């Protein structure tokens, strides 16, 4: 699948923009939209999801790698009857400090620049301790950091990225930090290529909570 995805990189529609925000502190320097024909489609979808991705100019992350991984993650979400209707990647030109996740600095970034949620943000590293490859922040664990609600932060080098993206999206869409020990379940504590399944109960919660929180729309 990864080889096929590389073939459509050149077909992305992208627009170069230079939008000054907050006294030129943060600028969008590139926007890429992924054609919808590359999105996984659920046979009986009941809801639509729009995903917003954010990367940084001069970061270690490559836009192609980010979007390839996101597209590979989509079938793991569509099994819950949720189709992805739109995926856009914006590359931000910011001070270097914003390329590293930490609660106070990342809150400052999202006060300076408004993101569309749910938002996936790809940073060079994290200052959190213990350091995780990804940090998902739903409504229930954003009470002391409301700017970060419904965002996911991925550190460069995150392992098994497509499965990590799907795993963290389920956390945010469900507003639930719980894991599962069920065999081959996507929400096992450690992601792996063989862990792809979600139960009916997990999908029901995802749809109900995400719709209530305005993260997906009912068809």
Predicted regions and their residues:
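Catalytic Zn2+-binding segment of zinc metalloproteases
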Residues: 169-184
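Stable alpha-helical elements in mature extracytoplasmic
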Residues: 65-72, 161-165, 169, 202
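Propeptide-to-catalytic entry region of secreted or membrane-anchored zinc metalloproteases
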Residues: 23-128, 214
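Bacterial N-terminal signal peptides
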Residues: 8-18
């Amino acid at each position: 699948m990864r080889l096929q995805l590389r073939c459509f990189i050149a077909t992305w529609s992208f627009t170069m923009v230079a939008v000054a925000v907050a006294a030129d502190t943060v600028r969008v320097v590139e926007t890429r939209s992924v054609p919808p024909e590359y999105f996984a489609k659920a046979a009986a979808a009941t809801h639509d999801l729009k995903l917003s991705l954010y990367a940084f100019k001069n970061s270690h992350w490559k836009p192609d790698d980010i979007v390839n991984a996101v597209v590979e993650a989509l079938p793991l979400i569509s099994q819950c009857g949720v189709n992805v209707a739109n995926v856009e990647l914006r590359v931000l030109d910011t001070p270097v400090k914003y390329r590293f996740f930490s609660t106070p600095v990342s809150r400052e970034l999202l006060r300076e620049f408004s993101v569309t949620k749910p938002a996936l943000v790809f940073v060079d590293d994290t200052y959190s301790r213990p350091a995780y490859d990804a940090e998902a922040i739903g409504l229930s664990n954003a009470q002391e950091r409301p700017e970060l609600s419904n965002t996911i932060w991925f550190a460069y080098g995150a392992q098994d990225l497509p499965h990590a993206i799907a795993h963290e999206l389920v956390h945010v869409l469900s507003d639930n930090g719980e894991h599962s020990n069920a065999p081959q379940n996507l929400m096992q504590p450690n992601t792996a290529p063989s862990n792809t399944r979600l139960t009916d109960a997990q999908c029901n919660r995802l749809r109900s909570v995400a719709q209530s929180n305005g993260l997906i729309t009912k068809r």
